[in-house]
Amino acid sequence: SYVVAVKRDRDSRGGSAFIHDHMRIGDVIAVSPPRNNFPLNEDAEHTVLIAGGIGITPILSMVRRLALNGSSFDLHYSCRNAAEVAFYEELGQFGNLNLHLSECGGRLFDLGTIIAEAPQGAHFYCCGPKSMIDAFELAATGINASQVHVERFSNDSEVAVEGGFVVKPQREGRSFAIPPGRTILSVLKEAGLDVAFSCEQGICGTC
């Protein structure tokens, strides 16, 4: 079975609002097979997990697996306040939870110190807001890239506003012009092609 955590986002494209407003217990939905672009290295001698807000979702699976294996790990979870802490009851069962509540006078989320105090060879995993991941990657400068893992909710790349190009799908006998400001996926979908996709942001790699 799946456990899916979806935070209602007023700036979303509508998916989170639909789930909160319309989906009910007993509804049947179609889902694609799971994909994992944020795999856990279970052979690491120590693991440092860093989550912000709903970024705890993929991290929680890692917590469960590491705890099951009896592996050494630390979890740092940052939220604005206690009301935004997801899965608190389950996470509270782990003695190595470090909770950071920015609006409640809690301990500052010092990524540099967290990284510096980790054992040599530790693997680091971070998922959360863009600002957190950017700060984490900066603080992790100097750590072997194979030990640093992130999962983002949005793509930093911007769609080109100048130029344009032509694509010819391998299984199609025709070409498609991609104008400035458009993505290949949006043009192919508009043309009626059956293109596999998921996030529509160029992150997951499905398309």
Each language-model region and where it sits:
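A short, well-structured juxtamembrane/interface segment
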Residues: 32-41, 106-114
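Conserved S-adenosyl-L-methionine
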Residues: 65-73, 144
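Short, glycine-rich nucleotide/cofactor-binding loops
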Residues: 46-57
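Short hydrophobic segments within beta-strands
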Residues: 7, 50, 76-78, 126-127, ...
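Histidine-anchored nucleotide/phosphate-binding helix
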Residues: 56-67
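Structural motif
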Residues: 46-48, 74, 123
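Reductase modules of NAD(P)H-dependent flavoproteins
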Residues: 81-207
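Ferredoxin-reductase
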Residues: 1-32, 36, 42-46, 79-81
